[in-house]
């Protein structure tokens, strides 16, 4: 029996079970430290997919938010293991550019997880990671659409295809079955063999739509 990601759902700060899924994946990979990045960080905690990792001190965090919701001075005064940036990611100010500015080293061995939730431009923002490739990449799709590009945001299949081109494989999705969809989980190819789920066709890896349909 294949162990689908959503079976490990648990929310501390996250909205769709990501905190529990992250814990499951990182424990399976025997990772307990490193760097995590969240773009679309809000105040650092609300619906966060990374706060449960950096707030306990085990991980360094890079928090990026384009609005004033992120109180940089307050957060950085309370946590010395995070860097906060009020930045709008664009073609002239990429994620790669922001990562280059942070106070701690980031490389392929310690860049554990990145979560991208920017309401519609997630795919372009993910591409702007450039040379920085986290082990786990969490990206928000348009939860209503698997393969059709008929509305705002990226389809699930577009994110899966991006992952293939970027050196990743699709692990499945977060979400609460029968309630709402969550995020697409991608794992870097040099780690995918540690999970049986990656041996199945992508349609069988746990796709949750906002209508509650499960594929």
Task: Describe each model-derived feature in a short phrase.
Residues 6-102, 109-116, 143:
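SAM cofactor-binding core of SAM-dependent methyltransferases
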Residues 35-38, 52, 56-60, 106, ...:
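Conserved acidic-Pro-Pro-aromatic motif
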Residues 1-9, 208-214:
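Membrane-proximal basic amphipathic "stem/tether" segments
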């Amino acid at each position: 029996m294949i162990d689908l990601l959503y079976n490990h759902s648990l929310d501390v700060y996250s909205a769709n079970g990501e905190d529990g899924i992250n814990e499951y994946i990182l424990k399976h990979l025997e990772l307990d430290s490193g760097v995590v990045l969240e773009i679309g960080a809000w105040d650092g905690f609300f619906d966060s997919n990374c706060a449960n990792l950096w707030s306990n001190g085990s991980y360094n965090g890079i928090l990026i938010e384009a609005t004033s919701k992120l109180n940089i001075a307050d957060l950085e005064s309370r946590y010395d293991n995070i860097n906060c940036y009020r930045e709008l990611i664009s073609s002239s100010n990429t994620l790669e550019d922001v990562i280059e500015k942070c106070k701690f080293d980031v490389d392929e061995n310690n860049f554990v997880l990145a979560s991208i939730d920017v309401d519609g431009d997630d795919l372009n923002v993910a591409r702007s990671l450039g040379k920085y490739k986290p082990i786990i990449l969490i990206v928000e799709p348009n939860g209503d659409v698997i393969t059709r590009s008929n509305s705002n945001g990226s389809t699930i299949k577009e994110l899966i295809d991006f992952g293939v081109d970027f050196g990743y494989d699709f692990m499945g999705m977060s979400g609460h079955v029968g309630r709402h969809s969550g995020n697409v989980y991608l794992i870097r190819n040099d780690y995918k063999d540690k999970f049986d789920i990656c041996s199945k066709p992508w349609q069988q890896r746990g796709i949750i739509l906002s209508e509650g349909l499960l594929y």
